[in-house]
Amino acid sequence: LAQLIGTIRKVKKKLNRGLYIEGLLMSMFDQRNSLTHKVAEEIKKHFNEQVFKTIIPRNVRLSESPSHGKTIIEYDKNCAGAKAFNKLGNEFLRRNRKTQ
């Protein structure tokens, strides 16, 4: 993550001064894995408000949908992954309404 932030800073400095990070999204989150929780805590500690509150869980249906040539909403709109992406979309829109 630190390397990615560094790369974004370099691109911003040399190529696109208007570039900014809209937010950090935690995905493939495995609720059963303690390391996942520790990493999430560290990310929230360092990046605080930049971290989206919505977390995309590890979900079999999410991994299956591309092989069927469908979005997750088309494939299984009621699975946990689809619901999380809908929630993320709403969170993204709320954030952007506040900044406009």
Q: Where do the language-model regions lie?
A:
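A sequence-composition feature that detects small, non-aromatic residues
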Residues: 2, 40, 80-84, 99
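Conserved catalytic-core segment of NTP-binding enzymes
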Residues: 1-60
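Hydrophobic "lid"/C-terminal helical patch
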Residues: 88-92
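Generic signal for short, ordered secondary-structure residues
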Residues: 22, 64-67
